[in-house]
Amino acid sequence: MTSTSEQPPSQRPSPWRPLALALLAVLGLLAIWSKIRDPEEPTATTPFVEAPVDEVTRLGLVALRQPSTGTLNVLVVFAQFQNEIGLGERIPDYATRMFDPDTPGSFTHYYNEMSFGQLQINATVLPRRYTSTQPASAFLADTSTEYGGYGDFSHEIMKQVDADVDFGQFDNNGPDGVPDSGDDDRIVDYVFLIMRSVPRNFLYGGATGIKGLGRDVVTDDIGAKGRKIMVLRKGYTGSIVAERPYAQTVGIMAHEFGHGLGLPDLYDTSFQKVANQDPADDSAGIGRWGLMGRGAYGWTEDASQGPSPMSAWTREQLGWVGVDNDQLQQVIMPAGGLHLTDVRHGGSMLKVFL
């Protein structure tokens, strides 16, 4: 993916070209997150393959995104196809622990650590699994180079959920921090749709995760301003992910939610548009060094250590280098005496201009 550059002020010496480096903290200055695999869940080696993003998102030019500070109310829905109904409606035992803020390795703990507490995630996990009225085959694309019918699937599931849930309680992006209070936008903050299985060509080829729900849903719930609450198909309001063991599921969700914050992928996605090109033969971008690269599973393919921390560049974009980037130190001129210490304990991240 292409990363944006930053132009230093004109008074800076001309020998220094205004190209912003990926921050030095990628190696030593990332906040080291304590990552623990759920001991009750086996590890697995299921690769995470993401569906292609649109050009605007690819360039990091998302006009609409979730705020990176405050409190968001997230709805979590587990779902399956009609042909899986024999497996029952029970959700995974780890489902609620994924959002325990006091559990290292949870989704909520991860984003609390990365944001220095500036973004709080309140999640509601629905207690049963929802089932479509049609089998998986009804939603599959004919080829691996076109999108599948995941939008129709998600629309049906959201309509089922609408009978059980007041979607107004998940519209909480206004300044007062109170859901559906009148200062919100009548759009549900964020929905995770977690699939028991993701067959090939359901999303896009072999993808197991995608930003966006594919279709808008107008719910039956009336908001504070007398208008119906909506669930939008856009990538900043939801995602569809494959159900995996605990740590893998958290990693995929964390990556997709990053798109909801307006972050681009930090790896080369050309393999998704070139027939028979192996992803391993292409550029991995920042690789496993950051969540928005290939870091959803962390340093091991079984995700036993949880997702990688966000890169320093990513955190700068969100204002998360300390609180409102107050620990970002810009190095404009050659300087000595710089010390790299843990950002969790007041250390700085360095941004070096060349």
Task: State each model region's role.
Residues 65, 109-226:
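Active-site-proximal segments of metallohydrolase catalytic domains
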Residues 85-125:
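Active-site-surrounding "flap" and adjacent substrate/cofactor-binding loops of secreted or lumenal enzymes
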Residues 19-32:
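Hydrophobic membrane-insertion alpha-helices, especially the h-region
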Residues 1-7:
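N-terminal intrinsically disordered, acidic low-complexity segments at the extreme N-terminus
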Residues 33-102:
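N-terminal module-boundary/linker segments of secreted carbohydrate-active enzymes
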Residues 9-22:
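N-terminal Sec-pathway targeting helices
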Residues 71-75, 186-191, 287-288:
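Loop/turn elements at helix/coil->beta-strand transitions in domains of secreted/extracellular proteins
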Residues 190, 196-354:
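Extracellular hydrolytic enzyme modules, especially secreted metalloproteases
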